Amino acid sequence: MDMRVPAQLLGLLLLWLPGARCAIWMTQSPSLLSASTGDRVTISCRMSQGISSYLAWYQQKPGKAPELLIYAASTLQSGVPSRFSGSGSGTDFTLTISCLQSEDFATYYCQQYYSFP
């Protein structure tokens, strides 16, 4: 008996797998922020669907690889200063820098790891 399944049919069946997740859209704001040393800075990240606490925050400086700051929405990576904090769950998350230092001037990214393409 021939058990081969056409690729098109297999793709269609995969769409109906129980628990299959759709793509998650992420919106980070503000896209550009002006701040001075000593300021309290807040960056938000909103998901198109709930991701529990499967969110990480990264800091990237020019010419360097991104560095993990926070994972599981609010857990500080070892060695990261306590002025950084994360909060939120579900669809809305926040990264806060309580007292901005000169070495904190960088690009910040949020990343969800609840669902992968």
UniProtKB/Swiss-Prot annotation:
Signal peptide extent: 1-22
Keyword annotations: Adaptive immunity, Cell membrane, Disulfide bond, Immunity, Immunoglobulin, Immunoglobulin domain, Membrane, Secreted, Signal
Gene3D superfamilies named among the record's database cross-references: Immunoglobulins
Region: Complementarity-determining-1, residue numbers: 46-56
Top-rank taxon, per record: Eukaryota
PROSITE patterns associated with the record: IG_LIKE
Entries under Pfam families matching the protein: V-set
Function field: V region of the variable domain of immunoglobulin light chains that participates in the antigen recognition. Immunoglobulins, also known as antibodies, are membrane-bound or secreted glycoproteins produced by B lymphocytes. In the recognition phase of humoral immunity, the membrane-bound immunoglobulins serve as receptors which, upon binding of a specific antigen, trigger the clonal expansion and differentiation of B lymphocytes into immunoglobulins-secreting plasma cells.
The name this protein goes by in its record: Immunoglobulin kappa variable 1D-8
Organism: Homo sapiens (Human)
